[in-house]
Amino acid sequence: MGKITDRVEDLAQPIVESQGLELVDVEYVKEGENRVLRVFIENPEGEVTLDHCENVSKNLDEKLDEVDPIQESYILEVSSPGIERPLKKKEDFDRFSGKLAYIKTFAPVSGNKEITGIIKGRDGDNIKVLKKDDDKELEIPFSQIAKAHLMVDFDNITG
């Protein structure tokens, strides 16, 4: 299924960028009897609006109909990535430095395959994270990250 998401990313990228938005991620999953194509977008200037989602959805739907990279029927969903935004690119770890994240690695890093901690940026291809449970700083090779996303830091919510 990775090839479908790669092809959709290639089609979606110029559509999303033409509206001043950023493409965060593309997922193609089976949910029950349905296949769902999810496209996550972000507005670097602020919030993603319903108009943003509708415009990207309409333009991408037209492009997908034209190119037809997916043979079976599917549901197209376009939305913001939400509060647990995926961290997919090295630059995401620079942008979200100081934020709480969950990181799962392919192989253990200092004995851990699952790490929750504060992103401290990166050093070249290594992501620096201050582990939440013991305040130990780890350097994780970007190539070893299987999955990563932001988390809500309930300990630092004020109100």
Curated annotation (Swiss-Prot):
Organism: Halothermothrix orenii (strain H 168 / OCM 544 / DSM 9562)
Pfam families per UniProt: DUF150_C, RimP_N
Official protein name in the record: Ribosome maturation factor RimP
Family, similarity comment: Belongs to the RimP family.
HAMAP family associated with the record: RimP (MF_01077)
Gene expressing this chain: rimP
Alphabetical UniProt keywords: Cytoplasm, Ribosome biogenesis
UniProt main location, coarse: cytoplasm
GO biological process: ribosomal small subunit assembly; translation
Role summary: Required for maturation of 30S ribosomal subunits.
Record InterPro entries: Ribosome_maturation_RimP, RimP_C, RimP_C_sf, RimP_N, RimP_N_sf
PANTHER family, per the entry: RIBOSOME MATURATION FACTOR RIMP
Cellular component annotations (GO), alphabetically ordered: cytosol
